[in-house]
């Protein structure tokens, strides 16, 4: 019985060591950024989603900008940074790249967001650096970001008071108050 426990513990320890090694040796992919109007394609593995993917396994809808286009990336940045263990690694007026780290093994997922202001759309790509499957984490996170962005990305609302006309008739003049 004790031989079985020692073997199981050794296998578990080796597995943890391999996962840790994968985590610390994974490098930033060289194909990130927008090239010719497109984010990098997803690899064949299921650990990636992209709004510009050509296949349904990897495709995810882009974000729609409903509010001010000029402030869209700042609003998105605020939403993205609500995610734990997130670091912004690159940022321009129309592009945001972040790294998400997992809690236990510190695996890194690279995410990119690219604003096309003329069509009020933010394309996104999120992909794990290491491993094959992410158990749907990139898709779930991207959908959470979409929901949160939709909540903060509202057009500036107009006050309903503007539809009632000039309110000066309701204010008594100096002669009426004396």
Where in the sequence are the language-model features?
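Ser/Thr-rich, low-complexity intrinsically disordered terminal regions
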Residues: 4-8, 18-178
